[in-house]
C-alpha cells in the first residue's frame, strides 16, 4: 500500500513519494509534506526553468536559484515565472 501525505502544495491527502529524492533537511521536508503529483508538477517547472534560463547544474548559484524556486513553488504557493514563456491555449 502506498504511503500518503498531507500535501502542502495540493492542500489534500495524496500519495507520497516512494523515497527521499532531495538531500538534507529540505529533502526530509519534501518527503514528509509533498505528494508524487506535486513533485511531478515541480519537475516540469524545473525543466522549463533550467532550459529557458540556460541554468548549469554544475554552477552553485544556478543550483541555489533553482532550490529557492522549488521552495517558493512547493511550500509558499508561488508560481514559477519563466520570462518569455506563454502557455499554450486550448482551442475550444
From Swiss-Prot:
The keyword Magnesium does not apply. SUPFAM superfamilies: YggX-like. Keywords: Iron. InterPro entries: Fe_traffick_prot_YggX (IPR007457), Fe_traffick_prot_YggX_sf (IPR036766). GO terms for cellular component: cytosol. Signal peptide: none annotated. The keyword Isomerase does not apply. GO terms for molecular function: iron ion binding. Transmembrane segments: none annotated. It comes from the Bacteria. Pfam families: Iron_traffic. One of its GO terms (biological process) is cellular response to oxidative stress. NCBIfam families: PRK05408.1. Could be a mediator in iron transactions between iron acquisition and iron-requiring processes, such as synthesis and/or repair of Fe-S clusters in biosynthetic enzymes. Belongs to the Fe(2+)-trafficking protein family. This is Probable Fe(2+)-trafficking protein. It comes from Shewanella piezotolerans (strain WP3 / JCM 13877).
Amino acid at each position: 500500500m502506498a504511503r500518503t501525505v498531507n500535501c502542502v502544495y495540493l492542500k489534500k491527502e495524496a500519495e507520497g513519494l516512494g523515497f527521499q529524492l532531495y538531500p538534507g533537511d529540505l529533502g526530509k521536508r519534501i518527503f514528509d509534506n509533498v505528494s508524487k503529483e506535486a513533485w511531478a508538477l515541480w519537475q516540469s517547472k524545473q525543466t522549463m526553468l533550467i532550459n529557458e534560463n540556460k541554468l548549469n547544474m554544475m554552477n552553485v548559484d544556478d543550483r541555489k536559484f533553482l532550490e529557492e524556486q522549488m521552495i517558493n513553488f512547493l511550500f509558499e504557493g508561488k508560481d514559477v515565472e519563466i520570462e518569455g514563456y506563454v502557455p499554450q491555449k486550448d482551442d475550444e
